[in-house]
């Protein structure tokens, strides 16, 4: 109707209606072109994809999974990114740079007494964050693993509210090394919940003891 009716109308008011309708449809994720319609990125789709409610839903889900699986739970939370750079001005009042990302999911888990018991660890291509309850055990287990696997790395920590940022000093410290190390600690149960991005914990990554997978990606 927009293409064949309003746009072809001889009435200027119809052309204005077409422009308004196209603008509204685009905000809903539908783009009207010269030949038809197609899906497109939109403010609404971004709000839905990066909604804080997705992270908040982790708590009741993992609470129930932990009740059923007990100490044997091995949960993985996958997000699209560590934090988003896709927040545009018109929705900035609804989303911040952490919305929908791994850091937001990690902090959500730490905020609840039950999910905090899973001792979550966040791992991305640039960052390792560890629940403050787990830091000492994590460092001890990591240093032992590095010693056994020839990793000449010195680990340091930077404390934040509720968690610590773990850094490695040494030429061997890289995502390839620390993802392998953290995966093994996860398998052992040092941590029972990993939070990461699909780029690292997606296709090609394997941990045989996973029994809970929560996919927060937009795909």
What is the predicted role of each segment?
Residues 195, 200-218:
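A short beta-strand element within the Helicase C-terminal
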Residues 1-193:
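Conserved C-terminal RecA-like helicase domain
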